[in-house]
Amino acid sequence: MKTAISLPDETFDRVSRRASELGMSRSEFFTKAAQRYLHELDAQLLTGQIDRALESIHGTDEAEALAVANAYRVLETMDDEW
């Protein structure tokens, strides 16, 4: 899909240089950057959900250990292509 975006000249120049250094097109660079940012946002959301779950069961060490173990299982199933 083609789209047009506006960005500061300095950012455009930096992206152009770095994409060239990496041997990729600007489109590929922006695609990878957007995917990485979306992955980061998803991870932050998941971290917040884990924190809230821990707060809701705050009390016993056993319950906290179980919640942490479950959180690690969820994180291990996430796709991490970077």
Curated annotation (Swiss-Prot):
Changing R26A: No DNA-binding. Keywords: DNA-binding, Toxin-antitoxin system. Induction: Strongly induced (about 10-fold) by nitrosative stress. GO terms for biological process: detoxification; negative regulation of growth; regulation of DNA-templated transcription. Pfam families: RHH_1. The keyword DNA-binding applies. One of its GO terms (molecular function) is toxin sequestering activity. Antitoxin component of a type II toxin-antitoxin (TA) system. Upon expression in E.coli and in M.smegmatis counteracts the ribonuclease activity of cognate toxin MazF6. Forms a complex with cognate toxin MazF6 which neutralizes the toxin. Interacts physically with non-cognate toxins VapC27 and VapC40. This is Antitoxin MazE6. The gene is mazE6.
